[in-house]
Design a protein with these regions (language model features):
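Peripheral (often C-terminal) accessory segments that flank ATP-dependent C-N-forming ligase machineries
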Residues: 59, 166-167, 174, 186-189
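Active-site nucleotide/adenylate-binding loops and adjacent lid/helix of ATP-dependent enzymes
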Residues: 25-111, 115-117, 128
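Generic secondary-structure signature for well-ordered alpha-helical cores
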Residues: 44, 103-106, 143, 185-189
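Phosphate-binding site of ATP-dependent enzymes
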Residues: 90-178
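Conserved metal-phosphate-binding beta-hairpin within the catalytic cores
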Residues: 112, 123, 184-196
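A short, GP-enriched loop/loop-strand-helix hinge that lies immediately N-terminal to
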Residues: 1-31, 45-48
Length: 196
């Protein structure tokens, strides 16, 4: 990794007073745990979850969740740390994946996996009216047979097998735009972002 990328670059540009596009350092990289808390505060539905710091805590945490359970790193970008095996069907698989996440990232987020469609909606700050951020037409990720979520290989290695389509169902589009705007405002969002 480049030593001057991501949050470090944003912080440097802020310190130097340079203009840049995108989020400021307070909004640039919220943890998955922070996003779960904000989702609840914004009344945006999200899967049940638990954060664990030790493999010994997995069994207790898993009792509050329904399988399958998805294991993710505490921070998220580019599906790093998420593999096909991140979707766990039982406690044995869950402990194995959590051990890998904790070894690599220090903690692990466990969340109930919801079988279904996957969408993303882009949003940008509105300089004329901060209370009305601008949402863009949502898109749906369409997975090939045998795949049920976007993991690192699906996103970066086998991306040609996945397709993206605009959301044409007006009801779904409206819901996605409204939920994205609520999250952005609740998080005091700025610049631009996306909500999956």
């Amino acid at each position: 990794d480049d030593a001057l990328s991501g949050i470090g670059l944003v912080q440097l540009m802020e310190k130097m007073g340079l203009a840049f596009t995108g989020a400021d350092s307070k909004f640039f990289d919220p943890s998955r745990q922070e996003m779960k808390v904000y989702a609840k505060k914004a009344n945006v539905p999200a899967p049940s979850w638990a954060m664990v710091d030790r493999v010994e805590d997995v069994e207790r945490a898993a009792k509050k969740l329904r399988y399958p359970v998805l294991v993710k790193p505490p921070h998220g970008y580019a599906s790093v740390g998420i593999t096909r095996k991140s979707r766990c069907e039982n406690l044995e698989q869950l402990k194995e994946q959590v051990a890998l996440e904790i070894n690599q990232f220090g903690r692990a987020l466990l969340e109930e996996f919801i079988e279904g469609r996957e969408f993303t909606c882009l949003i940008a700050e509105n300089p004329d009216d901060p209370n009305s951020p601008v949402t863009f037409k949502p898109v749906e990720f369409i997975f090939p047979e045998g795949e049920s979520f976007k993991h690192y290989d699906m996103k970066w290695v086998e991306y040609e097998k996945m397709s993206v389509a605009p959301v044409n169902d007006k009801r779904i589009e409206k819901t996605l735009r409204e939920q994205t705007a609520r999250m952005f405002k609740t998080m005091d969002g700025n610049g631009y972002a996306r909500c999956d």
